[in-house]
């Protein structure tokens, strides 16, 4: 059975802290991306090394100023910075173990695709779940974090390929990311572990 390793646990703890610091009501993919970057580690180094625009400070500014929503807000005649300021100051509270629908959708899609690549042998079948699946989730197209990455001028598909390359067996080709797969037990397990990780102190 898969259990999570320290990289997964520390990323979830950092995600919880980021959501709390930003006064969020729920955990979103943007908090997960910030948590992954705040904790650092080999995959964070891979992502930042692939595109220097994706750093903790840059993503934090992007989240605070809602740069992913700027085109839509401007179309409505609202400044993204003004919209962000209108929401401040936010009370400091910890979300009560609720994940936003976009984060749930991204985690479901990423964990199902990741599980498929493991099943067919294109990624190692490790016994411990690490932060790889979390990185893959924040780069999924429906996730807000993916839009933030694009707004910073980076390519989520390119970063995903870098993450997959780092996760693959050394010397093996980078596996192609599946477009659609059926969700199964790995997806349910990842959701349970995320829930547990976001509750832990």
Segments and roles (model prediction):
Residues 1-201:
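Histone-fold recognition with a strong bias for associated Lys/Arg-rich disordered tails
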